[in-house]
Amino acid sequence: MRRPRGEPGPRAPRPTEGATCAGPGESWSPSPNSMLRVLLSAQTSPARLSGLLLIPPVQPCCLGPSKWGDRPVGGGPSAGPVQGLQRLLEQAKSPGELLRWLGQNPSKVRAHHYSVALRRLGQLLGSRPRPPPVEQVTLQDLSQLIIRNCPSFDIHTIHVCLHLAVLLGFPSDGPLVCALEQERRLRLPPKPPPPLQPLLRGGQGLEAALSCPRFLRYPRQHLISSLAEARPEELTPHVMVLLAQHLARHRLREPQLLEAIAHFLVVQETQLSSKVVQKLVLPFGRLNYLPLEQQFMPCLERILAREAGVAPLATVNILMSLCQLRCLPFRALHFVFSPGFINYISGTPHALIVRRYLSLLDTAVELELPGYRGPRLPRRQQVPIFPQPLITDRARCKYSHKDIVAEGLRQLLGEEKYRQDLTVPPGYCTDFLLCASSSGAVLPVRTQDPFLPYPPRSCPQGQAASSATTRDPAQRVVLVLRERWHFCRDGRVLLGSRALRERHLGLMGYQLLPLPFEELESQRGLPQLKSYLRQKLQALGLRWGPEGG
């Protein structure tokens, strides 16, 4: 391809500078209000200038082989002229020359050549000491040329041309920018239509809200209003199970919703299986809420009597929820502790989890039901209840205060005078355990048996702890971390599993020292935390030597 006569030879392009010009149909002049003055004023600030005209590099696959003869993979014989045209555009000395190169070689023009031409136009208009004159017809022809060919541009070229056209001062409502913007929108992937949100009322609205993956998007007031608007036939077991799971999952202790679930369970008693009932009673135990519905417990006792032998795991799950509420029916306990039931569940896939739940029920009978005279879980069938920290604590360990409390106890007492994450019989995991003498002196744990003897079955309730303390004068102090997720949301009520553990540890003779999360969060740094722990321990009458503090 030959260069037009009268044009200077090749030379390196000047440093990239911005410029502005008017769009088609307007007279161009470097007025003070034009983009040209902004770009020229940026000459003293290379960072600003480079930022104004910074565009993504042209893809190498569009350029063809270089002048050194490198041939791109799959490049055809036209790769050389394409690259040559790009060099000519980059070295053009006037807007008219840019237009001639693009207009005289239509077979060699590729989409990226138009972005190269716009970039070179900006360099020419921003050149010093005086930019070359620009004819209005030249800008119009260049705009029309880009508008006519922009349907063949790829999305990268459209973005670059649109970016440069705006920087060069083409009006945003002019034909060039509008055409490029229209092509850009056409290249965008189709946007999925917004989900239809019909006005759902009553049970349908409640089910739609509870079926949404992001449960917390719907506040309690929305659930309460949807429940109030629902007709009785719209409240199906599926909807009520979704509501129960929602409350349990998000620790929402909402009395109005819980009472609605209890009323539904009583009304639909004959239509519900134990597998559905276990899901409906789950939030009551987890949220430590005993409903006001008078027929709630009699209804559950009748369901357990009817369905106990049909679904063993569901039966035990229902009893676990009632255990957290301290409402264990004796008749159901007789059934689950019977040899036939124990032998039956031993051969099922969920035998281990059922034995763990039965072990917890046996502990509850031992500590909380002195009047029970029925069968019990044999010793050989008992397993540790919670041999390790609960799943929620392990999942939120990085938000827990356990590590900093452990460091505070280590510096305050010494490593030998406390135990962390120790599991005590019959299988409760403690946060921190201390041993103290009858006078209150903190003793090294290794010199004492950290476990209190599990009360024998013959001991009535109320005598287990006293008999343990008379045989062993040393007292065991359990520091209980009460983290934010141990409570119901927006309340001060412990979750059922936490309340059950603390209740049983207290009945076994352990002295509990709660450490609420509000008090732990208010401590700023380890020195304040040590002072806080010192006050807590001294309030119990504990003392320790200076070597530990």
From Swiss-Prot:
Q: What class of enzyme is it?
A: transferase
Please provide the record's keywords in A-Z order. Answer: Apoptosis, ATP-binding, Kinase, Mitochondrion, Nucleotide-binding, Phosphoprotein, RNA-binding, Serine/threonine-protein kinase, Transferase
In what way is this protein post-translationally modified?
A: Autophosphorylated on serine/threonine residues. Activated by dephosphorylation.
Superkingdom of this entry's organism?
Eukaryota
Task: Specify whether Nucleotide-binding is a keyword of the entry.
Answer: yes
Q: Which one GO biological process term can you cite for this protein?
A: apoptotic signaling pathway
Q: Which residues form the RAP domain?
A: 477-535
- By what name is this protein known? Fas-activated serine/threonine kinase
Give the originating organism.
Answer: Homo sapiens
- List the molecular function annotations (GO) for this entry: ATP binding; Fas-activated serine/threonine kinase activity; protein serine kinase activity; protein serine/threonine kinase activity; RNA binding
Known EC number(s)? 2.7.11.1, 2.7.11.8
Specify where the region named Disordered lies, as residue ranges: 1-30
Q: Which PANTHER family match?
A: FAS-ACTIVATED SERINE_THREONINE KINASE, FAST LEU-RICH DOMAIN-CONTAINING
Gene behind the chain: FASTK
